[in-house]
């Protein structure tokens, strides 16, 4: 059972500021594979049922930005366009999609802005969403009359005004940004579009999962479960299974 935000306990100095690659590989891939994730602090929620300003109270963790695992539905039964209606408004894509992973993309990052009201006359707000979805996924209609497009996408929600102020503060303080970690060359193909939490066609052996996650933690080592890491990685010597419980990287925005 998922803990409530009040039940979660973190060591002093803990910050959750993962890179795009870490979000896709360590969280989204594992979620779609029904594998344990490093930190159970991302809420499972159909965020398209709510206005963005209601979401922070539903998140397990976050101060200026909040993370959610959410399903994604089709706009039309036989189409591939996602339904972006949400709460009393809608999300509208902005800018170009960003591939995550090289040389072969593992995921896709899309930026969206929330508009209050009905399209095309909605009022633009300061609420931003970064939506991460898996690349190389079969999103064809797999069940008659099913509107499910993705079982899970990972979403980061924040208010643009707060983010701008935080970034300016970091620059003035001379803080260095977190360096992105290079992802693997490939990841197992995932099949989505079912009504289940994990598509039945999806399989992921320990070897494939180890290759997909073959890089060290850079922000949440201290709370990784040693037994789970050892079992998942199958003896991969790159990751130490003896973690210092007090070592937590101080995150930056």
Swiss-Prot record:
Keywords: Activator, DNA-binding, Nucleus, Stress response, Transcription, Transcription regulation. SUPFAM superfamilies: NAC domain. Residues 106-166 bind DNA. Residues 10-160 form the NAC domain. It comes from the Eukaryota. It is found in: Nucleus. The keyword Transcription applies. GO terms for biological process: embryo development ending in seed dormancy; positive regulation of DNA-templated transcription; positive regulation of leaf senescence; regulation of root hair elongation. The keyword Ribonucleoprotein does not apply. It holds the Pfam family NAM. One of its GO terms (cellular component) is nucleus. One of its GO terms (molecular function) is transcription cis-regulatory region binding. Induction: By abscisic acid (ABA). Induced by salinity and osmotic stress, and during leaf senescence. Expressed in germinating seeds, roots, leaf veins, open flowers and silique stalks. Transcriptional activator that positively regulates age-dependent senescence, dark-induced leaf senescence and stress-induced senescence. Regulates leaf senescence through the modulation of the expression of senescence-associated genes SGR1/NYE1, SAG113 and SAUR36/SAG201, which are involved in chlorophyll degradation, and abscisic acid (ABA) and auxin promotion of senescence, respectively. Promotes reactive oxygen species (ROS) production during age-dependent and stress-induced senescence. Positively regulates auxin-mediated responses in roots. The NAC domain includes a DNA binding domain and a dimerization domain. Plants silencing NAC032 produce abnormally shaped seeds. This is NAC transcription factor 32. It comes from Arabidopsis thaliana (Mouse-ear cress).
